[in-house]
Curated annotation (Swiss-Prot):
A cellular component annotation (GO) from this entry: chloroplast
Purpose: Usually encoded in the trnK tRNA gene intron. Probably assists in splicing its own and other chloroplast group II introns.
GO molecular function annotations of the record: RNA binding
Localisation per UniProt entry: Plastid, Chloroplast
Gene: matK
Chief location: plastid
Protein name: Maturase K
Species per Swiss-Prot/TrEMBL record: Adenostoma fasciculatum
Length: 504
């Protein structure tokens, strides 16, 4: 954010919280163009970069106020190549640019909070894989876990109202409301969950959804911190502190005192409650009894319904013992597997044999959902038998091999933290054989004949990818290399879940 602060002239607009002047700045859409839109698609339009000007942006925005906006006729498509490529291209540009503008207050608050608390920025914590070492370290001491699907708003106006607390610019909010009303059908009674996380325009909707979730999570964090701080306080003093909270003017405390009875705070005196969220799913885990977990569950439901105005069914939130339940999270099946070890102790003439039971965090590759994902994109059938990718048969041999290798490399990279590699090897086998069948189909030959003619060098990249990466990490230790190749490795450069791994 520091790189763009001077360029965007934020100091001038930040004084009055005005964001709408930035809508007419060309470099905002250049940033959105670089970050959000597909460069190869846009450059296919003849003369796109020459027509990308402030006049074009103003014309695009003015179309939003017309009666038949967002509808382009065939004549318009022929006259304007910029708008003729895709009917929704200009609306996507406006939404991407608007998302960049609305992100400014959030980014500035984040930078100021980091500077105030003197927190050193750690870019490694952005990685999805950084969550798993936390689970591995904390979950071994916990007993109960609950999978929670975060409810999404049934009306997009709720998202706009939530954003109002962060963005103090009415003009920008009116533009957002108009945009949602005209293009995304604001009056729809039901907003599908997949629509919020869709790839058609993820930046704007992820911003709105995350601001909505951030609001209730801030209240959850406040209650969690206060309940942990007052864990040993007697109930009488505790209720006195509640009345004291009502007199203070913190947003989380006001919401809490207005929406919930004071006695409910007594339920949450648990210092071992852990909360993890990614996209629309969260995990609650605790060391205490199932009764306390059940109270936390109903607290979340009341928080969603009374404050966030979203409906949730308590019966769909299940509480399970961590030792007997697998958690499906971030494309992994995670569980706590008991690891039994026998220890022999000898003291003088007496010897003792003790069974030592320890919990081990186990992460598995979900083979069945992955095969379904591969079958959906035509790499195999529903039974997992490899088939040729007919859509790629017209490409060159190099492009076909490169595509398969990149998919296999990404899956191996993402599932490097698996405790057991057998399922991952099966997925790689499906991709390798599908690649060979695609090449054989292109050359009108059988798989056996094609392999005999080209030999084993054809698929060397499939086999050597992990060894090459690990040889850079452990260049002189062959035993360590083999050990880590079989074990778990968490990478700190994975910023989004793999498409094939996202089965939800």
């Amino acid at each position: 954010m520091e790189e763009f602060q001077g360029y965007l002239e934020l100091d001038k607009y930040q004084q009055h919280d005005f964001l709408y002047p930035l809508i007419f700045r060309e470099y905002i859409y250049a940033l959105a163009y670089d970050h959000g839109l597909n460069r190869s698609i846009l450059l296919d339009n003849v003369g796109y970069e020459n027509k990308y000007s402030l006049l074009i942006i103003k014309r695009l925005i003015s179309r939003m106020y017309k009666q038949n906006n967002f509808i382009i006729s065939a004549n318009d498509s022929n006259q304007n190549k910029f708008l003729g490529y895709n009917k929704n291209l200009y609306s996507q540009m406006i939404s991407e640019g608007f998302a960049v503008i609305v992100e400014i207050p959030f980014s500035l608050r984040l930078v100021s909070s980091l500077e105030a608390t003197e927190i050193v920025k750690s870019y490694n914590l952005r990685s999805i894989h950084s969550i798993f070492p936390f689970l591995e370290d904390k979950f071994s001491h916990l007993n109960y876990v609950s999978d929670v699907l975060i409810p999404y708003p049934i009306h997009l106006e709720i998202l706009v109202q939530t954003l109002r607390y962060w963005v103090k610019d009415p003009s920008s909010l009116h533009l957002l409301r108009l945009f949602l009303h005209e293009y995304y059908n604001l009056n729809s009674l039901i907003t599908p969950n997949k629509f919020i996380f869709s790839k058609s325009n993820p930046r704007l909707f992820l911003l709105l959804y995350n601001s909505h979730v951030c609001e209730y999570e801030s209240i959850l964090l406040f209650i969690r911190n206060q309940s942990s701080h007052l864990r040993l306080t007697s109930s009488g003093i505790f209720f006195e502190r509640i009345h004291f909270y009502e007199k203070r003017k913190y947003p989380g405390e006001e919401v809490f005192s207005n929406d919930f009875p004071s006695a409910i705070l007594w339920f949450f005196k648990d210092p071992f409650m852990h909360y993890v969220r990614y996209q629309g799913k969260s995990i609650l885990a605790s060391k205490d009894s199932a009764l306390l977990m059940n109270k936390w569950k109903y607290y979340l439901v009341n928080l969603w319904q009374c404050h966030s105005y979203v409906w949730s069914q308590p019966g769909r939130i299940c509480i399970n013992q961590l030792s007997k339940h697998s958690i499906y999270f971030l494309g992994y099946f995670s569980s706590m597997r008991p690891n039994l070890s026998v220890v022999r102790s000898q003291m003088l003439e007496n010897s003792f044999i003790m069974d030592n039971a320890m919990k081990k965090f186990d992460t598995l590759v979900p083979i069945i959902p992955l095969i379904r994902s591969l079958a959906k994109v035509k790499f195999c059938n529903t039974l997992g038998h490899p088939i040729s990718k007919s859509a790629w048969a017209d490409s060159s041999d190099f492009d076909i091999i490169d595509r398969f290798v990149r998919i296999c490399r990404n899956l191996s990279h993402y599932y490097s933290g698996s405790s057991r590699k057998k399922s991952l090897y099966r997925i790689k086998y499906i991709l390798r054989l599908s690649c060979v069948k695609t090449l054989a189909r292109k050359h009108k030959s059988t798989v056996r004949t094609f392999l005999k003619r080209l030999g084993s060098k054809l698929l060397e990249e499939f086999f050597t990818e992990e060894q090459q990466i690990l040889s850079l990490i452990f260049p002189r230790a062959s035993y360590t290399l083999k050990k880590f190749y079989r074990g778990r490795i968490w990478y700190l450069d994975i910023f989004c879940i793999n498409d094939l791994a996202n089965h939800e």
